[in-house]
């Protein structure tokens, strides 16, 4: 698959407007400021392909990027940013429920968490969306480069525990900054897209 053949397709505020062409959808989810856009950019080796928001909570729609006419990378709106009005938070909740309930959308999930901190209550809710969907997913612990070597294993264990991840769910340490974990995540995504 040619990752350089990537294009932004559309930004939707309703699941009814999601592409219906049957291509696999690899959905990226995570709280505001966890680095979803940066991870997508690192995967594609493109600096500013997925917009990196200056302010957290900037991605309020579902953004679709088509890769080589073979799959979509789906950037779900970030969550958990305190300054977002309650009405927006409720709209986010409805949008996520609709996306996860639509059987023709999600193929595979990539849930991002911050490797430095324990997952938040919102992260637990997001992990449950994935677990209840029955669709396969991985958890990516981003910002690995901000940890000391001695902190990596304990932090990964805490993430797995707080999110109640079954052993079958892969946890990938990642650095969008340095590229650690890129090859592993890419392999997992390409494998999922071919199923």
Feature annotation, model-predicted:
Residues 1-83, 194:
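Conserved G1/Walker A P-loop phosphate-binding module
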Residues 3-15, 146-195:
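Canonical P-loop GTPase G-domain recognition
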Residues 22, 48, 61, 72, ...:
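Helical mechanochemical/support elements of P-loop NTPase systems and associated helical scaffolds
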Residues 43-47, 100, 163, 189:
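Hydrophobic aliphatic residues
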Residues 65, 142, 185:
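Residue-level signal for inorganic ion chemistry
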Residues 75, 142, 175:
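Active-site glycine-centered loops adjacent to acidic/histidine catalytic or metal-binding residues
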Residues 79-89, 116, 145-148:
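Flexible beta-alpha connector loops of hexameric P-loop NTPases
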Residues 94-169:
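Conserved C-terminal guanine-recognition region of P-loop GTPase G domains, centered on the G4
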């Amino acid at each position: 698959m040619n990752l350089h053949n990537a294009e932004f397709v559309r930004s939707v505020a309703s699941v009814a407007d999601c592409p219906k062409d049957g291509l696999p959808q690899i959905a990226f989810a995570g709280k505001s400021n966890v680095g979803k856009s940066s991870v997508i950019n690192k995967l594609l080796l493109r600096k500013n392909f997925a917009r990196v928001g200056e302010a957290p909570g900037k991605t309020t729609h579902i953004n679709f990027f088509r890769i080589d006419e073979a799959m979509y990378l789906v950037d779900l709106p970030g969550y958990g940013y305190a300054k977002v009005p309650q009405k927006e938070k409720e709209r986010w909740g409805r949008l996520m429920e609709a996306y996860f309930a639509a059987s023709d959308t999600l193929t595979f999930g990539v849930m991002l968490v911050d490797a430095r901190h324990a997952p938040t209550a919102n992260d637990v809710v997001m992990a449950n969306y994935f677990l209840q969907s029955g669709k396969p997913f991985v958890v990516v612990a981003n910002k690995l480069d901000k940890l000391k070597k001695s902190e990596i294993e304990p932090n990964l264990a805490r993430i797995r525990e707080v999110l109640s991840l079954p052993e079958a769910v892969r946890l990938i340490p990642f650095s969008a900054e340095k590229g650690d974990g890129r090859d592993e995540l890419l392999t997992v995504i390409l494998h999922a897209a071919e199923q």
